[in-house]
């Protein structure tokens, strides 16, 4: 059971582990202090995601569901590290109760997909989640990378961009099974 859990964690964070290794390799090679600082910030942001995502998996397997509070802790820690990285970031999560492992990890995976896509250019990110009969996730992003491609891995996602270049990503996840 323990091996299965570790295999699941490794499989679900393999891309981020590879990103982390790439940045560590680049960090060892760079002589530019500004680039080194930027890489260290990215390493912290990606490392936080790996730690928190694995924690969601562990808690979910142990308890059969994940509390909204646990998801809140994940997003708050990631937001704090994005602020340290230099991007304005805030996460507001309203509601409580339980979510299925799939619901919680889908929300956190979308958050990470946005962060990864915008990592070099992210200026600000506002995350708003409301948990009721369904889970509604809204993100407002100021960055240079277009995010419309996120509809591929997240088919239920809605994406808009306003005249000022702000991007809005919305996702509704039914709250079945984890109530």
What is the predicted role of each segment?
Residues 16, 23, 27, 100-128:
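Conserved ATP-binding N-box helix of the HATPase_c
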Residues 11-93:
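Conserved DHp (HisKA) dimerization/phosphotransfer helix of two-component histidine kinases, i.e.
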Residues 2-13:
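Short alpha-helical H-box segment flanking the phosphoacceptor histidine in two-component systems
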Residues 13, 146-155:
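Glycine-rich phosphate-binding loop
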Residues 2-4, 86-115, 133-136:
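Conserved short strand/loop->alpha-helix "switch" segment adjacent to the catalytic nucleotide/phosphoryl-transfer site
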Residues 137-145, 173:
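Conserved DxG motif in ATP/Mg2+-binding regions
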Residues 32, 38, 151-179:
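Flexible, glycine-/charge-rich segments associated with ATP-binding catalytic modules
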Residues 126-136, 140:
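Short beta-strand/loop element within the Bergerat-fold HATPase_c
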């Amino acid at each position: 059971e323990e091996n299965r859990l570790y295999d699941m964690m490794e499989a679900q964070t393999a891309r981020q582990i590879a990103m982390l290794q790439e940045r560590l390799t680049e960090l060892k090679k760079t002589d530019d202090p500004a680039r080194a600082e930027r890489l260290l910030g990215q390493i912290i942001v990606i490392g936080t995601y790996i730690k928190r995502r694995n924690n969601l998996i562990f808690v979910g397997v142990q308890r059969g569901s994940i509390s909204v509070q646990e998801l809140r802790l994940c997003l708050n820690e990631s937001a704090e590290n994005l602020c340290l990285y230099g991007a304005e970031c805030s996460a507001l999560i309203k509601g409580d109760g339980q979510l299925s492992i799939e619901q919680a990890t889908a929300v956190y995976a979308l958050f990470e997909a946005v962060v990864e896509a915008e990592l070099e250019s992210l200026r600000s990110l506002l995350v708003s989640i409301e948990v009721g009969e369904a889970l509604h996730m809204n993100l407002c992003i100021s960055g240079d990378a277009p995010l419309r491609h996120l509809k591929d891995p997240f088919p239920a996602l809605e994406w808009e961009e306003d005249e000022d270049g702000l991007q809005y990503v919305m996702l509704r996840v039914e709250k079945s099974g984890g109530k």
